């Protein structure tokens, strides 16, 4: 495992992982907001 961190800078790897997870979370939330069932902002009142 230590050889992997000699190839890649751990700071850049962590920034990349967190950036990817943030983009993925935004995409999932916008997909849910585009549906009628899971739109918690402007959905139909039940």
Swiss-Prot record:
Subcellular location: Cell inner membrane
Coiled-coil annotated residue ranges, if any: none
Pfam families xref list: LHC
Gene Ontology molecular functions: bacteriochlorophyll binding; electron transporter, transferring electrons within the cyclic electron transport pathway of photosynthesis activity; metal ion binding
Cytoplasmic topological intervals: 1-12
Chief place of localization: membrane
Entry membrane topology: Single-pass type II membrane protein
Transmembrane parts of this sequence: 13-33
Keywords per UniProt: Antenna complex, Bacteriochlorophyll, Cell inner membrane, Cell membrane, Chlorophyll, Chromophore, Light-harvesting polypeptide, Magnesium, Membrane, Metal-binding, Transmembrane, Transmembrane helix
Record Gene3D superfamilies: Light-harvesting complex (4.10.220.20)
UniProt KW Disulfide bond keyword: no
GO-annotated biological processes: photosynthesis, light reaction
Residues in compartment: Periplasmic: 34-46
Domain of life according to the entry: Bacteria
Residues noted as binding a bacteriochlorophyll in the record, renumbered to the chain: 29
Keyword Membrane on entry: yes
Gene Ontology cellular-component annotations: organelle inner membrane; plasma membrane; plasma membrane light-harvesting complex
Subunit structure: The core complex is formed by different alpha and beta chains, binding bacteriochlorophyll molecules, and arranged most probably in tetrameric structures disposed around the reaction center. The non-pigmented gamma chains may constitute additional components.
Similarity annotation: Belongs to the antenna complex alpha subunit family.
Primary role: Antenna complexes are light-harvesting systems, which transfer the excitation energy to the reaction centers.
Name of this chain's protein: Light-harvesting protein B800/850/890 alpha-1 chain
Native source organism of the sequence: Halorhodospira halophila (strain DSM 244 / SL1)
Taxonomic placement: Bacteria, Pseudomonadati, Pseudomonadota, Gammaproteobacteria, Chromatiales
């Amino acid at each position: 495992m230590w050889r992997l961190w000699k190839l890649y800078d751990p700071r850049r790897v962590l920034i990349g992982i967190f950036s990817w997870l943030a983009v993925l979370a935004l995409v999932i939330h916008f997909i849910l907001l585009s549906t009628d069932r899971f739109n918690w902002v402007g959905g139909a009142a039940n």
